[in-house]
């Protein structure tokens, strides 16, 4: 029996998988009353006896700036070995999670009451963010009028887009809460990345307009920018108050795992940065040189364009059907193989993004003599098991009796 997976893996992981197959195929013996139970589970992959040495686990390097910036070239032989064992530990933890799903039929998680409580908290975070954005936008409009600073105006326009983003994200959240199985058969979860994508595109476009206005100001021969003492007092007080409120919202929204609330947290964090840059640029332009103000506005605009361009790319990847990581495909393959002893072969395992969650396609081979009713029940149970995973929105299980055929679907991507 063999398994073919749509993805790759480490050579050591393949050897570990092969060892587990051998252990599962030949390790079904036992003594006494436990012999029957052991024989019943002997067809399953079993990694209980595979554990990396404790000394290797203790020596694993942290995955931080050192790992990502300097890369493999900066690692010695001991670091590479420790990293390898760390990958093995993570793989085994994933397999244990799949074993829990197989044995219990569900993954330990929050109860219905706990989920409702979290949903209410997320709604409160969104409402607080929208109310704060409206109040702070009005305050920054006043600061812009009092100062005339291009940098502060750029920061105020960013707050205007906060209101727009709040409306877009609220609309997507509301749309997902009102399902229509006839008009939207697979749900509306694509509304979430699509709303973020639209907002990010608007942010990047406005940043370009700010750059053009700042360049025009630098090239003009007008009077240099300067704040009076009264203007300076108002601007500093307003901008510092706005920054402190935004910082508190960052810390609050980052306690949630919901993608929309996390988008608000990111938005509030950007506001903290832009508010400080705008204030510093206005003060430096007053006390040093007037050209610092439009330069600060250009810096804010470039920062806005870069940040939201990265957000656009991230959400585009989630919408175009990017494959899951090889490690995740390994977990799914492990789950499929241990699902039922009648599974003779795993032809295909695919997982790809279709919004914020995965769609999964699995092809398994069952005996050709198996009755249709039994084969259907095995496939349906596997589908339900896959859809219990929190990362998966929908799973499709295809049943077959052989695996030497051509692909069933038209491979339009190969034309």
From Swiss-Prot:
Side of membrane Vacuolar, spans: 146-150, 214-232, 292-293
- A GO molecular-function term, please? manganese:proton antiporter activity
Q: Which Pfam families match?
A: Cation_efflux, ZT_dimer
Q: Does the keyword RNA-binding apply?
A: no
Question: What are the UniProt keywords, alphabetically?
Answer: Ion transport, Membrane, Transmembrane, Transmembrane helix, Transport, Vacuole
Q: Which residues lie on this side of the membrane: Cytoplasmic?
A: 1-124, 172-192, 254-268, 314-415
Protein's UniProt keywords contain NAD: no
**Role this protein plays:** Involved in sequestration of excess metal in the cytoplasm into vacuoles to maintain metal homeostasis.
The family annotation for this protein states: Belongs to the cation diffusion facilitator (CDF) transporter (TC 2.A.4) family. SLC30A subfamily.
- Protein name, per record: Metal tolerance protein 5
Specify the species. Oryza sativa subsp. japonica (Rice)
């Amino acid at each position: 029996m063999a398994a073919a997976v749509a993805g790759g893996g480490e050579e050591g992981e393949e050897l570990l998988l092969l060892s587990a197959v051998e252990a599962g195929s030949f390790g079904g013996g036992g003594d006494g009353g436990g012999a029957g139970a052991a024989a019943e589970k002997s067809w399953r992959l079993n990694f209980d006896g595979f554990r990396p040495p404790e000394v290797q686990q203790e020596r694993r390097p942290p995955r931080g700036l050192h790992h990502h910036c300097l890369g493999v070239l900066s690692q010695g032989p001991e670091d590479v070995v420790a990293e390898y064992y760390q990958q093995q530990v993570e793989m085994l933890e994933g397999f244990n999670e799949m074993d829990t799903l197989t044995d219990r039929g569900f993954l330990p998680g929050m109860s219905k009451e706990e989920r409702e409580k979290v949903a209410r908290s997320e709604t409160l975070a969104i409402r607080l963010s929208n109310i704060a954005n409206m109040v702070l936008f009005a305050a920054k409009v006043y600061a812009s009028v009092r100062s005339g600073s291009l940098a502060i105006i750029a920061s105020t326009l960013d707050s205007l887009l906060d209101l727009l983003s709040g409306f877009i994200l609220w609309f997507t959240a509301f749309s997902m809460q009102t399902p229509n199985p006839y008009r939207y058969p697979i749900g509306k979860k694509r509304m979430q990345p699509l709303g973020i994508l639209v907002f990010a595109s608007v942010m990047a476009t406005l940043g370009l307009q700010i750059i053009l206005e700042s360049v025009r100001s630098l090239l003009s021969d007008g009077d240099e920018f300067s704040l009076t003492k009264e203007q300076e007092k108002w601007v500093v007080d307003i901008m510092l108050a706005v920054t402190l409120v935004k910082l508190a919202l960052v810390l609050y929204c980052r306690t949630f795992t919901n993608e929309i609330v996390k988008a608000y947290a990111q938005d509030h964090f950007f506001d903290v940065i832009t508010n400080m840059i705008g204030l510093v640029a206005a003060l430096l332009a007053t006390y040093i040189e007037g050209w610092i103000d439009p330069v600060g506005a250009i810096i804010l605009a470039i920062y806005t364009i870069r940040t939201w361009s990265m957000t656009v790319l991230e959400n585009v990847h989630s919408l175009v059907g990017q494959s899951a990581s090889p490690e995740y495909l390994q977990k799914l393959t492990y789950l499929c193989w241990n699902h039922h002893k009648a599974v003779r072969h795993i032809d295909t395992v695919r997982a790809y993004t279709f919004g914020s969650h995965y769609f999964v396609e699995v092809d398994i081979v069952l005996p050709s003599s198996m009755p249709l009713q039994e084969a259907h029940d095995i496939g349906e149970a596997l589908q339900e098991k896959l859809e219990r995973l929190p990362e998966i929105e929908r799973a499709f299980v295809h049943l077959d009796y052989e695996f030497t055929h051509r692909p069933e679907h038209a491979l339009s991507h190969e034309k």
